[in-house]
């Protein structure tokens, strides 16, 4: 990693632990900062805080005392999940203390070139695809960021022989200042996380931070299926490289079943290793990045053909007596479920849907669920999802939880059918996160096979 001295002997407050806060605290300590960690979880139930204290880092746990900010901190590094209306953050900003996320730290120390990927849907799959293609080409892609590996931790081991491939959420991008990727990708922009950002425009502005420091020598890969992306293309200093499944563009595009980059066929769409129209978009974004990094077509084709997907993202789980089970628990909004369904014959699909009720109706989903074999509906949003099913003329049963839903879906399916968990809702009404929900689906499928 680059050795920098801008934090040496500076007092820094790390607000919130989890993986990113723990990594940031250790990195700042290594860089000579005087670090204080503040986390809301009580010390006795906080293994991360206990470890940091043993390493000589000051920790304050069990709450967020505002008087802590009476100390003269030069910087706050916050956990990305903590909203900006948190009183600690509001007070820090009022005092003129910069508030960053650990993504900024990763950029400052990274010896490796950075490719940043953000968007509403497809981030993790696209990040993983890019990482695998670059690694196959000898460019040693290291995945980090929102994909589960703290960017500031991975950046410490990255050299100029690596490429840092970073999945970035809107929460993370709100806390960057100098962050400057060589290539950035925005997969798409949909109205999600409005409960955090308040307005869609604020959400878009957070995502747009990814390109703030980019210049003409840098590349911004945008999804020209969206008019919004076309509008944004004129507002960046970066060189825009578009991708599209709807039209021929000066970048990566789909035409007559083939994936092209600037007029040259790279591979056929049906050769991609994972189904769904959304994965065609993910593959096109990957192709654009790979070609910009000089990767040959054969390597791209071989890697994307062998790509097995990402856990909880249209993940093939198992086949039981001719019934295939797919785990798409990451589909926490309508668009994601629409794209998941596009990869299957509706007449052979038993869809499991429903979850956290955010107050939105599901009328947009009606054309996509029309013709489904059956639905299994659960969660807080069940009544709203049932109304959409009624409008689509789809028969359904209700379930109490994911295990019950999986068993009922299997009972409704016959040989040649697909049981698809693609909830179109967040998981928080029943489960801590979409991973827990998806893992329970996987576990229940395993029980059914016994």
Curated annotation (Swiss-Prot):
GO terms for cellular component: cytoplasm. It is found in: Cytoplasm. Coiled coil: none annotated. It is an enzyme of class 6 (ligase). Its main location: cytoplasm. It catalyses: UDP-N-acetyl-alpha-D-muramoyl-L-alanine + D-glutamate + ATP = UDP-N-acetyl-alpha-D-muramoyl-L-alanyl-D-glutamate + ADP + phosphate + H(+). Keywords: ATP-binding, Cell cycle, Cell division, Cell shape, Cell wall biogenesis/degradation, Cytoplasm, Ligase, Nucleotide-binding, Peptidoglycan synthesis. One of its GO terms (molecular function) is ATP binding. Its EC number is 6.3.2.9. InterPro entries: Mur-like_cat_sf (IPR036565), Mur_ligase_C (IPR004101), Mur_ligase_C_dom_sf (IPR036615), Mur_ligase_cen (IPR013221), MurD (IPR005762). The keyword Transit peptide does not apply. Pathway: Cell wall biogenesis; peptidoglycan biosynthesis. PANTHER family: UDP-N-ACETYLMURAMOYLALANINE--D-GLUTAMATE LIGASE. HAMAP family: MurD. Belongs to the MurCDEF family. Cell wall formation. Catalyzes the addition of glutamate to the nucleotide precursor UDP-N-acetylmuramoyl-L-alanine (UMA). This is UDP-N-acetylmuramoylalanine--D-glutamate ligase.
């Amino acid at each position: 990693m680059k050795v920098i001295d801008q934090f040496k002997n500076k007092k820094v407050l790390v607000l919130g632990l989890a993986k990113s806060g723990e990594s940031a605290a250790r990195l700042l300590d290594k860089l000579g900062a005087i670090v204080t960690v503040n986390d809301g979880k009580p010390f006795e139930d906080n293994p991360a805080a206990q470890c940091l204290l043993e390493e000589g880092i000051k920790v304050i746990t069990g709450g967020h005392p505002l008087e802590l900010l009476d100390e003269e901190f030069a910087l706050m590094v916050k956990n990305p999940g903590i909203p900006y209306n948190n009183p600690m953050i509001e007070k820090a900003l009022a005092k003129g203390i910069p508030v960053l996320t650990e993504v900024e730290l990763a950029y400052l120390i990274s010896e490796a070139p950075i490719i940043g990927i953000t968007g509403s849907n497809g981030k993790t799959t696209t990040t993983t695809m890019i990482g695998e293609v670059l690694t196959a080409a000898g460019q040693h892609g290291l995945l980090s960021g929102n994909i589960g590996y703290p960017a500031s931790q991975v950046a410490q081991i990255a050299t100029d022989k690596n490429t840092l491939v970073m999945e970035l959420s809107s929460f993370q991008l709100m806390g960057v200042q100098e962050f400057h990727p060589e290539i950035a990708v925005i997969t798409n922009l949909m109205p999600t996380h409005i409960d955090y950002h308040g307005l869609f425009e604020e959400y878009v502005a957070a995502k747009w931070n990814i390109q703030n420091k980019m210049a003409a020598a840098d590349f911004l890969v945008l999804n020209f299926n969206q008019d919004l992306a076309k509008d944004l293309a004129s507002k960046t200093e970066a060189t825009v490289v578009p991708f599209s499944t709807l039209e021929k563009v000066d970048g990566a595009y789909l035409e007559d079943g083939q994936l092209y980059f600037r007029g040259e066929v790279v591979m056929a769409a049906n050769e991609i290793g994972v189904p769904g129209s959304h994965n065609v978009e993910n593959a096109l974004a990957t192709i654009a990045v790979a070609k910009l990094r000089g990767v040959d077509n054969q390597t791209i084709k071989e890697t994307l053909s062998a790509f097995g997907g990402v856990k909880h993202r249209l993940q093939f789980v198992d086949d039981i007596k001719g019934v295939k089970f797919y785990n798409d628990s990451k589909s926490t909004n309508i668009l994601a479920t629409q794209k998941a369904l596009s990869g299957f014959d509706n007449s052979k699909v038993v869809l499991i849907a429903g979850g956290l009720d955010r107050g939105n109706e599901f009328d947009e989903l009606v054309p996509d669920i029309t013709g489904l074999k059956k639905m299994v509906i659960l969660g807080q949003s069940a009544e709203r999802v049932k109304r959409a099913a009624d409008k689509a003329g789809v028969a359904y049963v209700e379930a109490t939880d994911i295990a019950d839903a999986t068993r009922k879906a299997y009972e409704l399916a016959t040989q040649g059918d697909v049981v698809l968990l693609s909830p179109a809702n967040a998981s928080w009404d029943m489960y801590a996160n979409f991973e827990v929900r998806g893992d329970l689906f996987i576990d229940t499928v395993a029980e059914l096979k016994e």
